[in-house]
């Protein structure tokens, strides 16, 4: 046996991770460029200190207060409201997704998504021994509903993963598409990943509105993006209570630390302030889309806090040229395309200047 005794299908695989480079302008992992205010920081510090007093004890494994606060927050996006029994949380959306596949995927079961899609999905499937099947999106990155429905009926997946807005394209799904796939899935789960949901354009609804109609629908969110809490690592979902109960079977004991719960509650108390920058980022995003198109780029419509643009004969050369000028973006998505996060006005000015310089050099 080869040492170490790693599972054979994992040998030679590089760990997931975007480059973490120390450059002046970092626009590669879709973080919120605006940190919390001094008042929010003070509340977080006080809350963490209070939690530290009882760190010799295990935390509330049912995180009752946090579930109630998350339910209140999510209720803004659906007339039916959300109750705490419909909420689950974990250490980032990554752990939420992994728990879903641990509970509802596994050997002999299939997970489906539609490429281009979030690059971690097949890894969740691999790590849970769930068969992975990827359909294709249309050329404009929208979902070909007829083809998607046919794939679901053919593969009979236990879990369908639908990011909306999609990463890396920024494309949002219409509610009719989500509803039709919920019906086509039968008893399979339809997981709508709304990590970037708060950035969607005016009039684009959340899949949360569909929860009363479909017992197999799950909607996931995160505090990493709009809440400027990437360092917090708190993801959560809304679903039927029986789905949340099922996840309890696979969760690790006391998986959410007392400090994580306290800090997340503090952040939720400052939700209006933390989300106040979302409108500014939307404006910056829409201006970026217009500018890139004026520069002759193909640009995907975006409801997220990033923009996918192309098409480049050698996208790596463009990425490297930007990096050489102190701007880090992401080399991801379909061949020939690049993804840039929306930053502050100064960061976007630096990106535009660098891309103009790179284009001039390549002309």
Model-derived features: where do they sit?
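PLP-dependent aminotransferase class I/II
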Residues: 37, 216-293, 297-300
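Short Gly/Ser/Thr- and Asp/Glu-enriched loop/turn motifs at secondary-structure junctions
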Residues: 22, 84, 300-306, 333-337
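Conserved PLP-binding catalytic core of the aspartate aminotransferase-like
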Residues: 281-282, 291-325, 342
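Conserved core of the PLP fold type I
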Residues: 54-185, 196-213, 218
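PLP-dependent enzyme catalytic core of the Aspartate aminotransferase-like
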Residues: 320-325, 330-363
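N-terminal small-domain helix-loop-helix segment of the aminotransferase-like
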Residues: 2-92, 99
């Amino acid at each position: 046996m080869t040492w170490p005794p790693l599972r054979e299908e994992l040998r030679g695989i590089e760990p997931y991770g975007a480059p973490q480079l120390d450059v002046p302008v970092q626009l590669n992992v879709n973080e919120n460029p605006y940190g919390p205010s001094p008042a929010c920081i003070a509340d977080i510090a006080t809350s963490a200190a209070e939690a530290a007093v009882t760190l010799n004890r295990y935390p509330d494994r049912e995180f009752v207060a946090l579930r109630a606060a998350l339910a209140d927050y999510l209720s803004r996006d659906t007339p039916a409201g959300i109750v705490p029994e419909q909420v689950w949380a974990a250490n980032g959306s990554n752990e939420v997704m992994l728990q879903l596949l641990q509970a509802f995927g596994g050997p002999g079961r299939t997970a489906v998504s539609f490429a281009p899609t979030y690059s971690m999905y097949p890894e969740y499937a691999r790590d849970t021994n769930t068969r992975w099947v990827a359909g294709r999106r249309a050329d404009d990155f929208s979902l070909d509903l007829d083809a998607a429905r046919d794939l679901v009926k053919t593969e009979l997946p236990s879990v369908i993963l639908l990011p909306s807005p999609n990463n890396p394209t920024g494309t949002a799904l219409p509610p009719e598409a989500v509803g039709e796939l919920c019906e086509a899935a039968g008893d399979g789960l339809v997981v709508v990943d709304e990590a970037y949901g708060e950035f969607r354009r005016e009039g684009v609804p959340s899949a949360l509105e569909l929860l009363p109609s479909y017992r197999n629908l799950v909607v996931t969110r995160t505090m990493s993006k709009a809440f400027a809490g990437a360092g917090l690592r708190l993801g959560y979902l809304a679903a039927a209570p029986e789905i949340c109960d099922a996840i309890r079977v696979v969760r690790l004991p006391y998986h959410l630390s007392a400090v994580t719960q306290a800090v997340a509650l503090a952040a939720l108390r400052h939700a209006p302030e933390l989300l106040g920058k979302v409108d500014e980022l939307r404006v910056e995003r829409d201006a970026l889309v217009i500018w890139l198109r004026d520069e002759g780029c193909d640009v995907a419509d975006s409801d997220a806090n990033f923009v996918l643009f192309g098409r480049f004969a050698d996208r790596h050369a463009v990425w490297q040229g930007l990096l050489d000028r102190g701007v880090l973006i992401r080399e991801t998505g379909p061949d020939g395309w690049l993804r840039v996060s929306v930053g502050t006005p100064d960061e976007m000015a630096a990106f535009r200047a660098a891309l103009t310089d790179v284009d001039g050099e390549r002309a």
